Each structure stands twice: as C-alpha cells, then as structure tokens.
C-alpha cells in the first residue's frame, strides 16, 4: 500500500516514502540508466536503501517523495536541502526508464515546485542535469527553469567526466 498522498496531480501522486517502498527504490536505483541519470556509480543494496530511508524520515531539511502513477511507484522526487533562511532549495528526481517520455516527470516537478513556492514560501528552486541528459534539460526548461551555468567536467560517471548544467526558477 503506498504512503499517504502528499501532492496529487492529474497523472502522478507524490507520496511519503514508506518502508514497503524500499525494495522498489533499491531495484530502481540499481538500474544502470537510472543510476547514470543521477550521477551514481555504485548500486545500492537493500540495507543501504534502508539507511537512506531512515535518514529521510528523520531529516527536517529535505522532502523526499515517491512518484506514483495510479498506485504504481515509478520514481522519486525531492527538495534538498531546504534553506528557509535563504529561501532556496534544489529539486532532484528520477523515474524508471519504462515511464520516460510520458510527462510524469514534468507533472511531478510542477507539483513540487508549486509546493516549494506556495507552501514553503521559498524564493528559488535550483536543479541540475548532466550534459548527456538532454531529456532532463528539456524537461526543466519546459517547466520554466532557466539554465544559469555549466560546470565543465564536474562529475565522473561511467568512466567519463561530464558537465553539470545548473538551472534555476524564481518565484
């Protein structure tokens, strides 16, 4: 059973992560396409995922949510860290490959950005996408983010240095 609804859109629901979601999260994060898209190089095992879950539920400076389509978990989205004093946070997200290109990421980001601005009263949401991830860059631009800069060869993924493109959206 998925966790309680946090934010609901037409096609996705953002829910609290529950312990029963850990197996999905662990399997998804070990998918090479997902891992690459978020800059990971080492797959998580179930114990590492459980540790992540424990940190998430005890951390007041982040919001980490399960993205579901109907009742099916399809990804994760979060705001981290939430800096209330500066009014800024960063959004991070991933969706399992079989749901790419369906608009679920767009709707999930729109929901969480609205939450950041309207409920948390933040001034700015930032995001990053790697140079090879054109789809993520297009998604961010589609929902209104502006590219603010590029850190060249900032991260080492799968044997190659990759650029990191930084985006921002101001309320």
How would you describe each model-predicted region?
Residues 33-54:
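Conserved GNAT-fold acetyl-CoA-binding loop/helix
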Residues 2-5, 43, 61:
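Proline-rich low-complexity regions
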Residues 32-33, 60, 120:
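Structural motif
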Residues 53-66, 75:
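A short helix-loop-beta-strand connector motif used in the catalytic cores of GNAT acetyltransferases and
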Residues 1-13, 17-29, 68-171:
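Acyl-donor (CoA/ACP) binding surface of acyl/acetyltransferases
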Residues 36-38, 64-67, 164:
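Short, hydrophobic secondary-structure boundary micro-motifs
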